[in-house]
Amino acid sequence: MATYLIEVGTEELPADFVAAAIAQLKDRVSHSLTEYFLTPDGIEVYGTPRRLAVLIQGLPDQQADREEEIKGPPAAAAFKEGQPTKAAEGFARKQGVELSALEVRPTEKGDFVFVQKKTLGRPTPEILQELVLGWFTALEGRRFMRWADGDLRFPRPIRWLVSLWNDAVLPLELVNGSGKLEAGRISRGHRILHQGDVTLNNAADYVVTLQQAFVEVNPQVREEKIVAGVKAAAAEIGGEAEMPADLLAEVVNLVEYPTAVVGDIEAEFLELPTEVITTVMVTHQRYFAVRDRQDKTKLLPKFITISNGDPKKSEIIAAGNGRVIRARLADGQFFYRADCDEHLETYLPQLEAVTFQEELGTMRDKVDRIMEISQQIAEQLGLSEADKEIIASTAMLCKADLVTQMVYEFPELQGIMGQKYALVSGEAPAVAEGIFEHYLPRNADDILPQTLAGQVVGMGDRLDTLVSIFGLGMIPSGSSDPFALRRAANAIITVAWDAGLEIDLGELLAQGAKDFVTAHPDKTSPLEALQSFFIQRIQTLLQDEKGIDYDLVNAVLGDDAEYTERALTDLLDVGDRAAFLQSIRDDGQLAKIYATVNRSAKLAAKGNLSTDSLDPTGVINPEKFAQNSERDLYAGLVELVPTTEVARTERDYQKLIDGLAALAPTVERFFDGEDSVLVMAEDPAVRENRLNLLGLLRNHARVLADFGAIVKQ
């Protein structure tokens, strides 16, 4: 068994590309080898800022011989009166066999021509020479470039190639325009700590040889060293380091030989909000912040950076990094002090100079719309005047920090600085918290807003964006969603579910669409598109986030206007019904009533009873009963009416299920008992009466879900 190494050496690669390329190569190499009937013992993919490498262990010297049975054309097309046709000749020629090798065999679809073909295994090195460069040139990512006079695209110029089959060079040639790069056994060590070439004598020694040249090619090992180094450095200065996952993942692919270095900042900068300091450190400088071990709310006047340089020069490295961050923090300090000189409300007029979207006006216009929608939501929730005032102030000020100097310089601090400046301006803490929280959740893994102001204003902001962008016809399609509208809709639904907010989303969408058309008379109403979009988001969230079976989700959302309206009118109810259905499927209750309800619903579809009718009075004529099973079913339906009404108004669907379960034996008698009836009786009045009985049963079940959408399990 052999070991093969391919290393592609480059100029400094973007950190995000290194991580993405490693993931792509793992998948691509595995599938590629499988496609060529090669099964190695292991595949390792490595990456640093200057190289990507694949190390394949336990490769056979060649493919195994294999026999394949290949199906050809139908026998009727391949042979006419016992003689081969052009179809048979073409099939034989394509497979490289004589006509005599063709066999006719029966299949489920008739007789077909087959050939038993033996393929000799090819040498593995020969196959690799055809495949390996394609693994790299097919990589996907952003910010690709061309260099020299060639058309080859890669994030950075490729400078060297290593290709080793055990201890021998496996020749490869990368052509780029007039340039040509031939693979060998020469790699490169660390740019600073090991200047010059590194000779690789054997593919199996790749990792160790480069470690001796101060390059750790394994990103997992680099991460372990970084984590250990940062923790140790923080402990030495009496602190604990913050290590955000995103920052750690990026830093891992910024260095080849990581060393943790501690630097200092002036204590005066600690007057800045913690978020400003950590944003400068993490987002702009890729440093790790350090909190006081005794008081985690406080930052130490220190930072930890991961150096790719000489560990012996850590003091020089720390000083250089310190000068850079001090300049950034000094700017932040100036911005913060200048911004605090003004009341947050005084920034509102400046929003008139900030465009939200060309056809949708300024950010000041958007704030006005957010205020209006937020008050509509507050009215729906029946909030107190005090809560309404807090929401109104939050909505008015929620975007004011966008034009402050701090947020202009550090956009990622929007909302955070709004909260700080609101407190400095003397606004109520609830308003300040709402300004920050209205942006939550910022992504799928983020925390949710906990204050009414944050919840309501956040919904108002997102609803305005959705209605406005949909009104312009910019509806998400496929993977394209430049305005993050799916995330906005998900946030509205998730916040409502989490906080138990009984909002009428249908009414809000209708009013929003109406207001949009009033403001843009040349545009058509986006209402239907918005309704459909939100139903899709509810469906996705119930399945993917709540873990509800797909058919149960379909059952609560239905496929008609009644269910759509109900889902949008009462978001809490649709979530509750889906969760309840899942619970009674899991505990077996659903199975006990499924057949009864479904059979009734299918027959009821042949009648004309409206789906909103629950009371037998007026739709059932007891004088038309011929059997006791009809009378008992009627009596049971009469008793079920108050139960269903309670279930609907109080969302106590267990009562409804209990009522349906109690009625199930009566329904079974109606269909199959000694006093069963023929539903589709010849007498039209009798037939309608019996269909209406079943229709009423269906309608009671529909208060919970459309049982016709449920798949029997």
UniProtKB/Swiss-Prot annotation:
One Pfam family, short name: DALR_1
GO BP terms, alphabetized:
arginyl-tRNA aminoacylation; glycyl-tRNA aminoacylation
Enzyme category, top tier:
ligase
Which UniProt keywords are listed?
A: Aminoacyl-tRNA synthetase, ATP-binding, Cytoplasm, Ligase, Nucleotide-binding, Protein biosynthesis
Q: Where in the cell is it found?
A: Cytoplasm
Q: Which reaction does it catalyse?
A: tRNA(Gly) + glycine + ATP = glycyl-tRNA(Gly) + AMP + diphosphate
A cellular component term, taken from the record's GO annotations: cytosol
Domain of life of the organism encoding this protein: Bacteria
PROSITE patterns given in the database record: AA_TRNA_LIGASE_II_GLYAB
Principal subcellular localization:
cytoplasm
One term of GO molecular function:
arginine-tRNA ligase activity
Q: What is its EC number?
A: 6.1.1.14
Q: How does it assemble?
A: Tetramer of two alpha and two beta subunits.
Membership in a protein family: Belongs to the class-II aminoacyl-tRNA synthetase family.
**HAMAP family hit by this protein:** Gly_tRNA_synth_beta
Q: What is this protein called?
A: Glycine--tRNA ligase beta subunit
Source organism per entry reads: Picosynechococcus sp. (strain ATCC 27264 / PCC 7002 / PR-6) (Agmenellum quadruplicatum)
